[in-house]
């Protein structure tokens, strides 16, 4: 039996185990998919040996990269990994975002506001760049990223001047919805 899973913390919100368990069952695949909630990556080498592949979620999309044997060119460019297969890291977040948002962007002059600077934000920024779309990045502190603005600088007018807002922060994740 092949073993797969997802690593991150928290994982209470994750539908991955249910989704893949159902998919494997429907398609007659001899595999299992489990949640691997971790406080840190201290056992990642053992986990990579035990699993055929796994997904990576918050907060490890960037910090897992030094542990990998190889990294796909796109994931390297993005600076974040969300899929690991046999020790090689990939990023599929960007294409998932691109495919999801494209039907809603009939006007290519839309201005996009990206909240957050973590792994998902990096994938979203990459997708927007691939689509030729301008965006404004919002960070915790002024000067954190060139061309970005701080949350403290967000105004009603600035929010209204952007037709798309993408939340790439952990705000609202279960179980800590606030």
Give the residues covered by each predicted segment.
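Conserved beta-strand elements of the Class I
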Residues: 5, 113-115
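Phosphate/diphosphate ligand-binding glycine-rich loop within oxidoreductases
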Residues: 2-104
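Glycine-rich Rossmann-fold phosphate-binding loop(s) that bind the pyrophosphate
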Residues: 9, 116-118
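N-terminal Rossmann-fold NAD(P) dinucleotide-binding loop
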Residues: 121-122
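NAD(P)-binding Rossmann-fold cofactor-contacting core
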Residues: 131-147
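Rossmann-like adenosine-cofactor binding region
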Residues: 147-178
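Short helix-loop-beta connector
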Residues: 105-111
């Amino acid at each position: 039996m092949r073993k797969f899973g997802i690593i991150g913390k928290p994982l209470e919100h994750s539908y991955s185990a249910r989704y893949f368990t159902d998919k494997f069952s429907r398609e007659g695949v001899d595999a299992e998919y489990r949640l691997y909630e971790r406080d840190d990556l201290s056992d990642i080498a053992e986990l990579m040996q035990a699993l055929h592949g796994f997904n990576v979620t918050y907060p490890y999309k960037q910090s897992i990269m030094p542990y990998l044997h190889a990294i796909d060119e796109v994931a390297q460019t993005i600076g974040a990994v969300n899929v690991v297969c046999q020790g090689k890291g990939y990023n599929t977040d960007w294409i998932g975002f691109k495919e999801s948002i494209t039907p809603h962007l009939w006007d290519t002059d839309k201005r996009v506001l990206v909240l957050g600077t973590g792994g998902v934000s990096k994938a979203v920024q990459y997708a927007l760049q691939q689509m030729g779309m301008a965006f404004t990045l919002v960070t915790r502190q002024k000067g954190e990223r060139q061309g970005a603005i701080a949350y403290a600088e967000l105004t009603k007018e600035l929010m209204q001047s952007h037709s798309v807002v993408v939340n790439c922060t952990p705000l609202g994740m279960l179980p800590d919805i606030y």
